[in-house]
Each structure stands twice: as C-alpha cells, then as structure tokens.
Design a protein with these regions (language model features):
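Conserved SAM-binding loop
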Residues: 1-3, 171-180
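Short, well-ordered alpha-helices that flank and scaffold nucleotide-derived cofactor binding pockets
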Residues: 2-6, 25, 155-162, 184-191
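The start of beta-strands in P-loop NTPase/AAA+ ATPase cores
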Residues: 11, 31, 168-169, 196
Length: 208
C-alpha cells in the first residue's frame, strides 16, 4: 500500500468480516479501507431503500406463504414443505450467486439440472411441480425488498443497477472464491481510470 499515491482511493476486499476488522485495526493509510462485499452491497441497498431488514430465513418464509402458510398446513403438506425446503433454498441461492435474473435470463430446465448436479443439490422426483414452485419462490424473493437475506446483499444491487462507491485501486484476496455476482460488484467498484489486483489460487476455486 505504501507504493500507492496517497491521493488514490484504495479498497481492500476482505473475505469475511473478521478479516476486514483486523485490517482496519492495524491502522490502514487514510486513503484505504477494508470491507466485505456483503457490506458494500448492503450499503448500496440502504442508500436505495433504508427500510430493508436482514433475515436469513427469507426463502423459508416465502416458500411457506406460497404453499398456503406454514401454520395452516396439515401434516402431509408440512412433510412436503420440509422435503422441498432445502433444495429450493440451495437453488435460489445459486441463482442469485450466478446472477440469473440480473445478469443472465432465468435458467432453463436443463441449466437448473446442470447447476444442481454440479453443486450436489438433490432435487425431488416431481420435477415439473418443483420447477414451478422454484420459479415462483425465486421471483418473489427478488422482488421483495423490505426483507433481504445475505445473498440479496450481493444480488439486489446488481439487479437494481445501483451505484457503488468507486476506488482508484481495488485489491481482492481469495479471489478464486468469487462468484459471478461478486465479480460484477468488484467491476462496478473500480473507478474510470482505476485498477484491480486479484490474488487467488484457481485450484481451490469454489465456482470453477
């Protein structure tokens, strides 16, 4: 950092909150700051709509509503709900991480199956009804802005084309673990004449 001119704004992308706090505690130069991408996305969302509340169970509640309300389900329907909950949560999360509906069109049936196989998501046998419910859950999740989950902190700012604070130099550690939506955020954080440095090991990549 000492070789970067003091007039240049420097942003360090931290892999998690603890690392960001440690970097800032060390006493970064006045022109540098360290945050997670989730923090960056949440800041952009708050500028757009300050009333959003964070709830990690967002998909769970949406699925329950679409199936008639959890408290109104009989035992059989409740069993179906719990059978569908995990794969729908996983697939909705993957859709957001890859930018479907924001950077890419909604995935085809073949793309859903390919994504599920690649990330070991076990899908139910009743494929047509599952895909319909998955699409409805995803659509409602991406339109519900008053409640957001951790995936939304990254996904919604891109879908809504929100403005990010830009820096002259962006440094990204553990870049092999970035998913497509995170990469898009980093690109939007780079100033017009800015640069980025990505440090990572492709052999440890989560998203390939």
């Amino acid at each position: 950092l000492k070789f970067i001119p003091c007039l240049n704004r420097v942003f360090l992308v931290a892999f998690n909150k603890q690392i960001a706090e440690e970097l800032n505690a060390r006493g970064l130069p006045s022109n540098a700051t360290a945050k997670t991408l989730h923090s960056v996305g949440l800041s952009a969302l708050k500028r757009h709509q300050n009333r959003s509340k964070v709830n990690g169970n967002k998909t769970r509640y949406i699925l329950g509503d679409l199936m008639g309300g959890y408290n109104l389900m009989d035992d059989e329907l409740r069993k179906t709900y719990f059978k569908l909950l995990s794969p729908i949560q996983r697939m909705v999360s993957l859709f957001k991480n890859f930018g479907y509906g924001a950077m890419l069109p909604y995935p085809t049936k073949d793309e859903v199956l390919e994504l599920a196989a690649k990330y070991s998501v076990e899908l139910p046998d009743e494929m047509d009804s599952f895909l319909k419910l998955l699409a409805e859950t995803f659509e409602k999740s991406t339109k519900q802005l008053n409640i957001i989950d951790f995936d939304d902190m990254l996904y919604l700012p891109i879908k809504l084309n929100l403005i990010f604070d830009q820096s002259d130099f962006v440094m990204v550690d553990e870049s092999q673990d970035l998913n497509p939506i995170q990469i898009e955020i980093v690109k939007k954080m780079i100033g017009e004449r800015g640069r980025a440095l990505f440090c990572g090991d492709p052999h440890q990549a989560i998203y390939g």
